[in-house]
Regions:
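An anion/pyrophosphate-binding glycine-rich loop and adjacent beta-alpha core
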Residues: 1-106, 172-178
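Glycine- and aromatic-enriched mobile tails/lids
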Residues: 25, 32-52, 58, 73, ...
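Membrane-targeting and insertion segments and their boundary/processing signals
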Residues: 67-70, 105, 112, 136, ...
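FAD/FMN-dependent oxidoreductases across multiple families
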Residues: 99-135
Length: 180
């Protein structure tokens, strides 16, 4: 399956698709449609939030259009300082502040325009615990493997996947190579 990150930059075009960290939503920023209305529960899972954004833009026609024709929804980052106090966005999201400031967007005071971005392919090649597959001498770990994360991979799991299954697959492949 494909996993979409719900908040990829939709504007400016120079950073189209750039991932806006999940920490923004985790701190309380909410997605809003062109009418300024919240249309999905805050902190929904990635797949549910992505689907809701796509539906809001494509089916309900409540997206915000950029000068290039791209559509997205607002990510209300200024809400973070209202919830946690002034300076929270600067302190907790310095990389995001710098990234958008390069394009004269102050995410402390201005919302970001976002749209789901293809983020991770949850494999497709079925593996055994040692990383082996039904294809002779093929060992797999990481994004190519299937069945490890399910449909909704959580942040950080892919690193653990590569470490655990990569090590297992490497050992099993080395043993297999001795026999070849």
């Amino acid at each position: 399956t494909m996993q979409y990150h719900p908040t990829g930059a939709a504007f400016p075009e120079q950073i189209l698709g750039l991932l806006v960290t999940e920490k923004v939503r985790g701190l309380g920023a909410q997605v809003l449609n062109a009418e300024g209305r919240q249309f999905v529960f805050p902190r929904e899972t990635r797949d549910a939030e992505s689907a809701a954004i796509i539906r809001e833009v494509k089916e309900r026609h409540l997206g915000v259009r950029t000068p290039s024709g791209m559509e997205g929804v607002w990510l209300d980052s200024p809400l973070i300082d209202l919830i946690h106090g002034p300076g929270t966005v600067q302190r907790e999201l310095p990389a995001m502040v710098r990234q958008f400031a390069r394009f004269d967007i102050d995410i402390v005071r201005e919302t970001m325009l976002v749209y789901p971005t293809l983020h991770y392919q949850n494999g497709g090649i079925a593996i055994r615990p040692d990383g082996s597959t039904d294809i002779s001498n093929l060992f797999v770990a990481g994004e190519a493997s299937g069945g490890v994360h399910g449909r909704n991979r959580l942040m950080g799991n892919s690193l653990l996947d590569v470490v655990v299954y990569g090590r297992r697959a490497g050992r099993a492949a080395a043993e297999r190579a001795k026999a070849v």
